[in-house]
Amino acid sequence: MARPELWLCRHGETEWSLGGRHTSHTDLLLTPAGVDEARELAKLLAGVAFDLVLTSPLRRASDTAGLLGFPEARREAALAEWDYGDYEGLTTPAIREKAPGW
């Protein structure tokens, strides 16, 4: 019997990740570079068979899964990034101005 394996892949670049802004529930699209990143990874994954592919329901993640060749990946709300609340969209330095111990 084969050992189970878990493969993890982060979504491609977004405008906010490019700028160092924290993103949780804001549903951002991939940048052109993010699309290219996913396409490059797809080449490495070509021919790999997975029993199950899961993705966050957010577009940046589900679009990445589709570009990787898994358009039918199951969307799981539990895989969405944590909620940054009032810090959504801010950079770490901007957050630390408001909350120095953050």
Task: List each model region and its residues.
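Active-site-proximal alpha-helix that buttresses catalytic centers in soluble enzyme cores
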Residues: R3-P4, C9-P71, K98
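Phosphate-handling substructures
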Residues: L68-W102
